[in-house]
Regions:
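Structural motif corresponding to the intra-repeat A-B loop/turn of tetratricopeptide repeats
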Residues: 20, 73, 107-108, 139-141
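Residue-level signature for tetratricopeptide repeat
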Residues: 12, 16, 62, 69, ...
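Flexible helix-coil transition and linker loops at the boundaries of alpha-helical arrays
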Residues: 1-3, 32-56, 87-89
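Long, ordered, amphipathic alpha-helical scaffolds
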Residues: 134-182
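Generic helix N-cap/helix-start motif at coil->alpha-helix transitions
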Residues: 4-7, 54-63, 90-98, 123-131
């Protein structure tokens, strides 16, 4: 791609803004790139993008990054739409976006959509286990002890954070949540 369709350059520009601490501008630049990309994609059918192609991989990164941005500001409807588009374009789910999409579905009480997605939530992912634990709690009002035990045994850092009485907001936390893969 060239010009505004060179998503490698646009991703690099976003990353530069993030490094400079210009987060709002980075989010806006990423969203603008997403809008340009979405205008290229057909409306009726999925257009898988090739991960091996640098511009396609950068385009997928833009979709995921913008979805995360919208999730962070609480625009879950936009985040869901972007994540659904991402899964259509990246059927191998290189970003494990299914986990964030499942979390959005739970937050928005989209239970049918969540149920359809649970097949793809792996016990190997701490995010997926936390999402399943949260969904079970939202539905029943009780903590699923089996999922809690799974979290404790396989994803101890997640378990410890869940059970912690305090959640300090330190530099390491801020770096983590401002990264592409928080």
């Amino acid at each position: 791609g060239s010009g505004k369709y060179n998503f490698v350059e646009r991703t690099a520009a976003v990353e530069r803004l993030v490094r400079e601490g210009r987060y709002v501008e980075a989010c806006e630049a990423r969203y603008d790139a997403f809008v340009d990309l979405a205008a290229l994609l057909p409306d009726e059918e999925a257009l898988p993008l090739r991960w091996e192609h640098p511009n396609s991989r950068a385009a997928l990164s833009i979709i995921y990054g913008s979805a995360v941005d919208h999730f962070r500001i609480g625009d879950l409807e936009m985040s869901m739409a972007q994540l659904e588009l991402l899964l259509e374009c990246d059927n191998e789910d290189h970003f494990e976006s299914v986990n964030l999409l499942a979390m959005c579905y739970v937050a928005c009480d989209e239970w049918d959509a969540y149920d359809d997605l649970t097949l793809y939530l792996s016990d190997k992912s701490g995010d997926a286990v936390v999402t399943r634990l949260w969904a079970a709690f939202r539905r029943s009002g009780r903590v699923d002890e089996q999922l809690l035990a799974l979290l404790r045994s396989r994803h101890r850092a997640y378990y410890d954070e869940l059970r912690a009485e305090e959640h300090p907001d330190d530099d390491a936390f801020r770096r983590d949540i401002s990264s592409d893969r928080p």
